[in-house]
């Protein structure tokens, strides 16, 4: 997957450019939230900035660092899943992570992978959450307070990322802490040590962050931006945007519920007969492995022959139901076995992982998917489903006197065809990335929009003297990074969310205070937010100010923000007219 996807991970204009540009600016001394706007916590941008300071700013610096983090995450996932499942299921789940989530592309835009993500806050948050649960597992093995403190430290760092992953990771860690203490039943002194170590370690990263940012901004502001980034998630006017309603599946609840039930029925149709057969095969004999093999062939052939007619991208919709069912069954088993640490601790870890997976799915509870945001939000649930299909459910059938491998065979066949079907989608998008954008360590493959970006970079080299500043609106900070041109305003990403949060008057004032020498308008249809074009359907005051203060000098392709045609427009500030 790494070789196949090499340099094809990012989107040429959307989201990831925001990430890499912010890291570059911070690596040169800019202050987050003051010199450059940011809606999430400060951990990820400063981590990426540190990488740029040490290894130099480039796309490949960030990509290689993220490949290393993916390897670390893979090891942690394997170690954790190995504690709650048998090796075949664990290996299969890890292969699912590599093939479906880590490197691929299942929608038109890149960015929804762990190498060039739309938000490092999310991918780093997933890693920190898994690390916290892993530290809890180490505590189960060694009973050392330092591992409880390490889990708390991971949660403290997690607070500095993104709100949804913090909620999920902290819910999982706190659940694990409570259940672990229930099993251990420590004395008062040890209880205080364990809880105190966890809480103190969790508090350290936010306190250090507050202290450092207080050196660069008023203390009140340090509380509301680096440490108060979660407040945007509570804004009702933002939550009401169609983008988030559709993403959660509440735009049309009836249709979403129907799609969920239809997908659930599909699972029952495929796996139900295998479960019944497994319950019926109670007598040992050679016929049982033969039937398991036959089941694998029949399911694989049946799905494979009609795979093009199956809505594979809808297959993740029942994940919340599956996680809820697995959680209830595991909780009952834990309550029954809580007095035996040897059997209770694996159940605690299983519950932690299920809580983490289920909490991550809340953002798309009625529209669960492994594409788009699902590359991270649905990843834990998908991996747990793999383990359940190949180990937990077959094990339950074995314990009832049945034959679990026949169910595992059906599950394996379905998973194999599903992975191949998803990889065919990845192949379609990768084949469309044939244009190289950028040079040297900044180079990556892009779709047809890459030709426009290359032309824009060439025009900037021809027309703009070195050191001249550039604003790319409403989105396209990747151009700033590739051209190494600073946007002097903090606001370089003007989607409807940013304009709701900051207000047009405030943004116009910021542009007036620090205007860019050049402006590039890039076509972007934002209909998913309920307003199609910047300057026409939203951001009118900002656009009017731009029109009054800049004049066009070159059009690249069709004029942007007019219709369905993609194009760019380069403008120069009026004061700079020759």
What name fits each language-model region?
Residues 135-157, 186-200, 292-297, 347-357:
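Short hydrophobic alpha-helices at membrane interfaces in multi-pass membrane enzymes
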Residues 7-22, 32-50, 56-60, 448-452:
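Extracytoplasmic catalytic/substrate-binding loops of multi-pass membrane glycan-assembly enzymes
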Residues 195-268, 362, 419-421:
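Membrane-lumen/periplasm interface segments of specific transmembrane helices
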Residues 39, 425-498, 507-529, 558-563:
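Short periplasmic/luminal acceptor-recognition loop of GT-C membrane glycosyltransferases, typified by
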Residues 64-88, 92-103, 131-134, 279-280:
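Transmembrane-helix motifs of polytopic, lipid-linked glycan transferases
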Residues 167, 313-329, 342, 347-351, ...:
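Hydrophobic/aromatic-rich transmembrane helices and adjacent perimembrane loops
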Residues 147-163, 169-176, 200-204, 299-307, ...:
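Membrane-interface alpha helices of multi-pass inner-membrane proteins
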Residues 124-150, 180-185, 262-279, 286-288, ...:
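Membrane-interface transmembrane helices that cradle and orient dolichyl/undecaprenyl
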């Amino acid at each position: 997957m790494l070789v196949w996807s090499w340099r094809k991970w990012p989107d040429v204009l959307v989201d990831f450019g925001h990430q890499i540009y912010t890291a570059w600016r911070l690596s040169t001394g800019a202050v987050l939230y003051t010199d450059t706007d940011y809606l999430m916590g400060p951990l990820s941008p400063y981590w990426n900035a540190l990488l740029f300071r040490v290894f130099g700013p480039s796309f490949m610096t960030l990509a290689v660092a993220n490949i290393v983090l993916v390897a670390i995450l893979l090891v942690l996932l394997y170690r954790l899943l190995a504690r709650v499942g048998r090796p075949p299921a664990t290996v299969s789940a890890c292969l699912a992570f590599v093939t479906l989530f880590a490197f691929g592309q299942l929608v038109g835009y890149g960015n929804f992978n762990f190498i060039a993500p739309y938000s490092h806050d999310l991918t780093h948050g997933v890693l920190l959450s898994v690390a916290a649960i892993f530290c809890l597992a180490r505590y189960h093995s060694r009973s050392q307070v330092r591992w409880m403190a390490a889990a708390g430290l991971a949660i403290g760092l997690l607070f500095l990322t993104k709100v949804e992953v913090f909620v999920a990771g902290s819910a999982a860690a706190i659940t694990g802490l409570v259940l672990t203490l229930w099993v251990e039943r420590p004395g008062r002194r040890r209880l205080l040590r364990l809880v105190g170590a966890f809480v103190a370690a969790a508090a350290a990263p936010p306190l250090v962050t507050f202290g450092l940012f207080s050196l660069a901004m008023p203390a009140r502001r340090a509380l509301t931006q680096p440490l108060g980034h979660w407040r945007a998630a509570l804004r009702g006017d933002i939550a009401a945007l169609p983008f988030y309603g559709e993403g959660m599946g509440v735009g049309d609840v009836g249709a979403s519920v129907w799609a969920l039930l239809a997908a659930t029925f599909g699972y029952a149709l495929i796996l139900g007969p295998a479960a019944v057969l497994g319950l019926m095969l109670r007598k040992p004999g050679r016929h049982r492995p033969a039937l398991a093999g036959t089941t694998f062939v029949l399911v694989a052939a049946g799905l494979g022959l009609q795979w093009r007619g199956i809505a594979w991208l809808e297959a993740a919709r029942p994940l919340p139901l599956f996680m809820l069912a697995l959680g209830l069954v595991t909780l009952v088993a834990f309550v029954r076995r809580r007095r035996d640490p040897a059997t209770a601790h694996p159940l605690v870890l299983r519950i932690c992982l299920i809580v983490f997976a289920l909490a991550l799915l809340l953002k798309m509870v009625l529209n669960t998917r492994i594409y788009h945001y699902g590359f991270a939000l649905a990843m834990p649930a998908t991996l747990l489903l793999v383990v359940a299909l190949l180990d937990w459910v077959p094990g339950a059938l074995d314990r009832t006197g049945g034959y679990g491998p026949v169910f595992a065979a059906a599950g394996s066949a379905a998973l194999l065809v599903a992975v191949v079907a998803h990889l065919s989608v990845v192949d379609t998008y990768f084949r469309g990335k044939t244009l190289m954008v950028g040079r040297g360590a900044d180079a990556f493959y892009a779709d047809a929009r890459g030709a426009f970006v290359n032309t824009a970079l060439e025009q900037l080299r021809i027309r703009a003297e070195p050191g001249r500043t550039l604003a790319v609106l409403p989105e396209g900070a990747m151009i700033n990074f590739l051209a190494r041109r600073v946007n002097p305003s903090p606001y370089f990403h003007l989607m409807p969310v940013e304009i709701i949060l900051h207000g047009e008057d405030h943004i116009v004032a910021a542009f007036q205070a620090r205007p860019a020498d050049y402006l590039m308008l890039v076509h972007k249809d934002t209909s998913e937010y309920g307003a199609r074009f910047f300057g026409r359907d939203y951001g009118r005051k900002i656009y009017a100010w731009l029109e009054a203060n800049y004049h066009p000098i070159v059009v690249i392709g069709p004029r942007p923000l007019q219709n369905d045609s993609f194009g760019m427009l380069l403008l120069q500030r009026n004061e700079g007219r020759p």
